[in-house]
Protein backbone atom coordinates (compact mmCIF):
# COMPACT_ATOMS: atom_id res chain seq x y z
CA UNK A 1 0.00 0.00 0.00
CA UNK A 2 2.90 2.35 0.73
CA UNK A 3 4.16 1.77 -2.81
CA UNK A 4 0.79 2.83 -4.23
CA UNK A 5 0.75 5.96 -2.09
CA UNK A 6 4.31 6.81 -3.14
CA UNK A 7 3.41 6.32 -6.83
CA UNK A 8 0.49 8.69 -6.38
CA UNK A 9 2.79 11.26 -4.79
CA UNK A 10 5.29 10.89 -7.64
CA UNK A 11 2.60 11.47 -10.27
CA UNK A 12 1.27 14.53 -8.49
CA UNK A 13 4.72 16.00 -7.83
CA UNK A 14 6.20 15.24 -11.25
CA UNK A 15 3.41 16.61 -13.46
CA UNK A 16 3.96 20.33 -12.62
CA UNK A 17 7.71 20.00 -13.16
CA UNK A 18 7.33 18.09 -16.42
CA UNK A 19 4.90 20.65 -17.85
CA UNK A 20 6.97 23.61 -16.67
CA UNK A 21 10.15 22.10 -18.14
CA UNK A 22 8.41 21.61 -21.51
CA UNK A 23 7.44 25.27 -21.48
CA UNK A 24 11.04 26.16 -20.72
CA UNK A 25 12.36 23.99 -23.54
CA UNK A 26 10.06 25.56 -26.14
CA UNK A 27 10.95 29.07 -25.01
CA UNK A 28 14.71 28.57 -24.80
CA UNK A 29 14.96 26.63 -28.06
CA UNK A 30 13.79 29.85 -29.73
CA UNK A 31 16.77 31.70 -28.25
CA UNK A 32 15.06 33.41 -25.29
CA UNK A 33 16.27 32.71 -21.75
CA UNK A 34 13.30 31.63 -19.64
CA UNK A 35 13.41 32.31 -15.91
CA UNK A 36 9.69 33.05 -15.55
CA UNK A 37 8.53 29.45 -15.08
CA UNK A 38 7.81 30.20 -11.43
CA UNK A 39 5.41 32.95 -12.54
CA UNK A 40 3.69 30.65 -15.03
CA UNK A 41 3.11 28.03 -12.35
CA UNK A 42 1.66 30.59 -9.96
CA UNK A 43 -0.57 32.20 -12.57
CA UNK A 44 -1.74 28.83 -13.86
CA UNK A 45 -2.61 27.64 -10.36
CA UNK A 46 -4.43 30.87 -9.57
CA UNK A 47 -6.40 30.92 -12.82
CA UNK A 48 -7.36 27.25 -12.50
CA UNK A 49 -8.65 27.63 -8.94
CA UNK A 50 -10.54 30.86 -9.63
CA UNK A 51 -12.13 29.39 -12.77
CA UNK A 52 -12.89 26.16 -10.93
CA UNK A 53 -14.59 27.98 -8.09
CA UNK A 54 -16.60 30.09 -10.52
CA UNK A 55 -17.65 27.33 -12.92
CA UNK A 56 -17.39 24.06 -11.00
CA UNK A 57 -15.80 22.54 -14.11
CA UNK A 58 -12.35 21.00 -14.19
CA UNK A 59 -12.20 21.50 -17.97
CA UNK A 60 -12.81 25.23 -17.61
CA UNK A 61 -10.20 25.35 -14.84
CA UNK A 62 -7.52 23.74 -17.02
CA UNK A 63 -8.39 25.93 -20.02
CA UNK A 64 -8.21 29.04 -17.83
CA UNK A 65 -4.74 28.04 -16.65
CA UNK A 66 -3.53 27.58 -20.22
CA UNK A 67 -4.99 30.94 -21.24
CA UNK A 68 -3.34 32.70 -18.29
CA UNK A 69 0.01 31.19 -19.22
CA UNK A 70 -0.39 32.17 -22.87
CA UNK A 71 -1.15 35.77 -21.90
CA UNK A 72 1.84 35.83 -19.56
CA UNK A 73 3.99 34.44 -22.38
CA UNK A 74 2.72 37.18 -24.69
CA UNK A 75 3.59 39.79 -22.05
CA UNK A 76 7.06 38.27 -21.74
CA UNK A 77 7.47 38.42 -25.53
CA UNK A 78 6.32 42.04 -25.64
CA UNK A 79 9.23 43.15 -23.50
CA UNK A 80 11.93 40.55 -24.19
CA UNK A 81 11.41 40.17 -27.95
CA UNK A 82 9.70 43.28 -29.28
CA UNK A 83 11.16 45.83 -26.83
CA UNK A 84 14.52 43.99 -26.68
CA UNK A 85 14.70 44.10 -22.89
CA UNK A 86 16.92 41.62 -21.06
CA UNK A 87 15.03 38.32 -20.90
CA UNK A 88 16.62 37.61 -17.50
CA UNK A 89 15.32 40.89 -16.07
CA UNK A 90 11.89 40.34 -17.63
CA UNK A 91 11.73 36.85 -16.16
CA UNK A 92 12.64 37.99 -12.65
CA UNK A 93 10.17 40.89 -12.88
CA UNK A 94 7.38 38.57 -14.01
CA UNK A 95 8.09 36.23 -11.10
CA UNK A 96 7.83 39.09 -8.62
CA UNK A 97 4.71 40.44 -10.32
CA UNK A 98 3.03 37.03 -10.19
CA UNK A 99 3.80 36.59 -6.49
CA UNK A 100 2.53 40.03 -5.53
CA UNK A 101 -0.33 40.07 -8.02
CA UNK A 102 -1.84 36.76 -6.96
CA UNK A 103 -1.73 37.81 -3.30
CA UNK A 104 -3.49 41.08 -4.13
CA UNK A 105 -6.08 39.29 -6.27
CA UNK A 106 -6.73 36.79 -3.47
CA UNK A 107 -7.43 39.66 -1.09
CA UNK A 108 -9.80 41.36 -3.52
CA UNK A 109 -11.68 38.21 -4.54
CA UNK A 110 -11.81 36.22 -1.31
CA UNK A 111 -10.83 38.59 1.49
CA UNK A 112 -7.61 36.72 2.29
CA UNK A 113 -4.13 37.26 0.91
CA UNK A 114 -2.95 33.79 1.91
CA UNK A 115 -5.34 31.27 0.37
CA UNK A 116 -8.54 30.80 -1.61
CA UNK A 117 -11.66 28.87 -0.61
CA UNK A 118 -11.50 25.12 -1.17
CA UNK A 119 -12.58 23.78 -4.53
CA UNK A 120 -15.75 21.70 -4.57
CA UNK A 121 -15.21 17.96 -4.84
CA UNK A 122 -18.39 17.21 -6.70
CA UNK A 123 -18.66 14.99 -9.77
CA UNK A 124 -18.55 18.08 -11.94
CA UNK A 125 -15.31 19.29 -10.45
CA UNK A 126 -13.40 16.04 -10.34
CA UNK A 127 -13.86 12.79 -12.20
CA UNK A 128 -14.52 11.01 -8.90
CA UNK A 129 -15.77 12.86 -5.84
CA UNK A 130 -14.24 10.56 -3.26
CA UNK A 131 -10.98 9.03 -4.38
CA UNK A 132 -10.79 5.57 -2.81
CA UNK A 133 -7.06 5.47 -3.00
CA UNK A 134 -4.27 8.02 -3.23
CA UNK A 135 -3.48 6.74 -6.73
CA UNK A 136 -7.02 7.27 -7.96
CA UNK A 137 -6.97 10.73 -6.44
CA UNK A 138 -3.80 11.59 -8.36
CA UNK A 139 -5.12 10.18 -11.63
CA UNK A 140 -8.37 12.12 -11.30
CA UNK A 141 -6.50 15.33 -12.18
CA UNK A 142 -6.36 15.62 -15.99
CA UNK A 143 -3.01 17.40 -16.08
CA UNK A 144 -1.37 14.15 -14.91
CA UNK A 145 -2.59 12.58 -18.15
CA UNK A 146 -1.89 15.67 -20.26
CA UNK A 147 1.79 15.85 -19.24
CA UNK A 148 3.08 12.70 -21.05
CA UNK A 149 0.97 13.54 -24.11
CA UNK A 150 2.54 17.00 -24.31
CA UNK A 151 6.02 15.51 -23.96
CA UNK A 152 5.44 13.52 -27.15
CA UNK A 153 3.74 16.41 -28.96
CA UNK A 154 6.52 18.85 -28.01
CA UNK A 155 9.19 16.47 -29.28
CA UNK A 156 7.31 16.01 -32.56
CA UNK A 157 6.70 19.74 -32.87
CA UNK A 158 10.39 20.60 -32.60
CA UNK A 159 11.66 17.80 -34.83
CA UNK A 160 8.95 17.19 -37.42
CA UNK A 161 7.17 20.48 -38.15
CA UNK A 162 8.03 23.67 -40.00
CA UNK A 163 7.29 25.73 -36.89
CA UNK A 164 9.59 23.55 -34.81
CA UNK A 165 12.43 23.85 -37.30
CA UNK A 166 11.94 27.61 -37.37
CA UNK A 167 12.02 27.76 -33.57
CA UNK A 168 15.30 25.82 -33.59
CA UNK A 169 16.73 28.03 -36.34
CA UNK A 170 15.89 31.17 -34.37
CA UNK A 171 17.63 29.74 -31.32
CA UNK A 172 20.74 28.67 -33.19
CA UNK A 173 21.26 31.19 -36.01
CA UNK A 174 18.70 34.02 -35.90
CA UNK A 175 20.52 36.17 -38.45
CA UNK A 176 20.70 33.32 -40.94
CA UNK A 177 17.04 32.52 -40.30
CA UNK A 178 16.10 36.15 -40.89
CA UNK A 179 18.09 36.16 -44.12
CA UNK A 180 16.02 33.17 -45.27
CA UNK A 181 12.82 35.11 -44.66
CA UNK A 182 11.93 33.64 -41.26
CA UNK A 183 10.08 36.23 -39.09
CA UNK A 184 12.28 35.68 -36.05
CA UNK A 185 10.35 37.90 -33.62
CA UNK A 186 7.03 36.28 -34.53
CA UNK A 187 8.45 32.78 -34.21
CA UNK A 188 9.95 33.59 -30.80
CA UNK A 189 6.65 35.11 -29.70
CA UNK A 190 4.81 31.97 -30.77
CA UNK A 191 7.27 29.80 -28.83
CA UNK A 192 6.92 31.97 -25.73
CA UNK A 193 3.11 31.91 -25.87
CA UNK A 194 3.03 28.13 -26.35
CA UNK A 195 5.65 27.64 -23.65
CA UNK A 196 3.74 29.85 -21.23
CA UNK A 197 0.49 27.97 -21.83
CA UNK A 198 2.11 24.57 -21.29
CA UNK A 199 4.02 25.66 -18.18
CA UNK A 200 0.86 27.16 -16.68
CA UNK A 201 -0.86 23.78 -16.99
CA UNK A 202 1.69 22.65 -14.42
CA UNK A 203 0.29 25.34 -12.15
CA UNK A 204 -3.20 23.98 -12.75
CA UNK A 205 -1.96 20.63 -11.44
CA UNK A 206 -0.76 22.32 -8.24
CA UNK A 207 -4.04 24.10 -7.60
CA UNK A 208 -6.37 21.26 -8.55
CA UNK A 209 -4.41 18.68 -6.60
CA UNK A 210 -4.45 20.80 -3.45
CA UNK A 211 -8.06 21.91 -4.13
CA UNK A 212 -7.16 25.54 -3.40
CA UNK A 213 -4.71 28.30 -4.24
CA UNK A 214 -2.17 29.15 -1.57
CA UNK A 215 0.07 32.21 -1.90
CA UNK A 216 3.50 31.34 -3.35
CA UNK A 217 2.42 27.70 -3.67
CA UNK A 218 4.86 27.10 -6.54
CA UNK A 219 7.56 26.90 -3.86
CA UNK A 220 10.53 27.21 -6.22
CA UNK A 221 9.35 24.49 -8.60
CA UNK A 222 9.84 26.85 -11.53
CA UNK A 223 13.56 26.98 -10.84
CA UNK A 224 13.72 23.20 -10.52
CA UNK A 225 12.09 23.07 -13.96
CA UNK A 226 14.78 25.41 -15.33
CA UNK A 227 17.37 22.97 -13.97
CA UNK A 228 15.54 20.09 -15.69
CA UNK A 229 15.74 21.99 -18.99
CA UNK A 230 19.52 22.33 -18.61
CA UNK A 231 19.99 18.74 -17.44
CA UNK A 232 17.85 17.56 -20.35
CA UNK A 233 20.01 19.52 -22.80
CA UNK A 234 17.03 21.46 -24.13
CA UNK A 235 15.33 18.30 -25.44
CA UNK A 236 11.67 17.75 -24.46
CA UNK A 237 11.89 14.05 -23.61
CA UNK A 238 15.17 14.34 -21.70
CA UNK A 239 13.98 17.40 -19.81
CA UNK A 240 10.74 15.60 -18.91
CA UNK A 241 12.68 12.60 -17.61
CA UNK A 242 14.82 14.81 -15.41
CA UNK A 243 11.75 16.72 -14.24
CA UNK A 244 10.05 13.45 -13.32
CA UNK A 245 13.16 12.42 -11.40
CA UNK A 246 13.18 15.68 -9.48
CA UNK A 247 9.47 15.20 -8.83
CA UNK A 248 10.26 11.79 -7.38
CA UNK A 249 12.62 13.46 -4.93
CA UNK A 250 9.79 15.77 -3.86
CA UNK A 251 7.54 12.75 -3.37
CA UNK A 252 10.25 11.08 -1.32
CA UNK A 253 10.42 14.22 0.79
CA UNK A 254 6.69 13.92 1.54
CA UNK A 255 7.02 10.22 2.40
CA UNK A 256 9.98 10.73 4.74
CA UNK A 257 8.32 13.75 6.33
CA UNK A 258 5.35 11.61 7.37
CA UNK A 259 7.72 9.14 9.02
CA UNK A 260 9.39 11.81 11.14
CA UNK A 261 12.85 10.28 10.67
CA UNK A 262 14.46 13.33 9.08
CA UNK A 263 14.04 17.03 10.01
CA UNK A 264 11.54 18.82 7.75
CA UNK A 265 13.99 21.59 6.85
CA UNK A 266 16.49 19.05 5.54
CA UNK A 267 13.82 17.29 3.49
CA UNK A 268 12.59 20.53 1.95
CA UNK A 269 16.11 21.39 0.84
CA UNK A 270 16.83 17.90 -0.54
CA UNK A 271 15.39 18.29 -4.08
CA UNK A 272 17.09 21.66 -4.54
CA UNK A 273 20.46 20.48 -3.21
CA UNK A 274 20.55 17.31 -5.31
CA UNK A 275 19.37 19.20 -8.41
CA UNK A 276 22.11 21.79 -7.90
CA UNK A 277 24.72 19.04 -7.66
CA UNK A 278 23.38 17.41 -10.81
CA UNK A 279 23.48 20.69 -12.75
CA UNK A 280 27.02 21.39 -11.54
CA UNK A 281 28.13 17.92 -12.57
CA UNK A 282 26.63 18.04 -16.06
CA UNK A 283 26.88 21.73 -16.93
CA UNK A 284 30.04 21.24 -18.96
CA UNK A 285 28.36 18.60 -21.11
CA UNK A 286 25.25 20.67 -21.87
CA UNK A 287 25.09 22.61 -25.11
CA UNK A 288 22.58 25.44 -25.02
CA UNK A 289 21.05 26.94 -28.17
CA UNK A 290 23.78 29.11 -29.68
CA UNK A 291 21.76 32.33 -29.63
CA UNK A 292 20.24 31.82 -26.19
CA UNK A 293 20.25 35.10 -24.33
Model-identified regions with their sequence ranges:
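Cytosolic-side transmembrane-helix boundaries in multi-pass membrane proteins
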Residues: 154, 172, 176-186, 253-293
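Transmembrane helix-bundle core of multi-pass membrane transporters
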Residues: 98-160, 263-268, 286, 291-293
Amino acid sequence: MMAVVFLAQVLSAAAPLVLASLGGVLSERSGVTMLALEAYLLLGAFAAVVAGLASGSIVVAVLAAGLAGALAGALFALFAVWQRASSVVVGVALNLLAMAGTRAALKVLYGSSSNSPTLPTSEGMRGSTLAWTALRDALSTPTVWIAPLLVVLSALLLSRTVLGLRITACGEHPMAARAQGVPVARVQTTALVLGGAIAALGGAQLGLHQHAFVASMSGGRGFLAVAAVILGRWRPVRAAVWAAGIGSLSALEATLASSGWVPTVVLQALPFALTLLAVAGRSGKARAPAALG
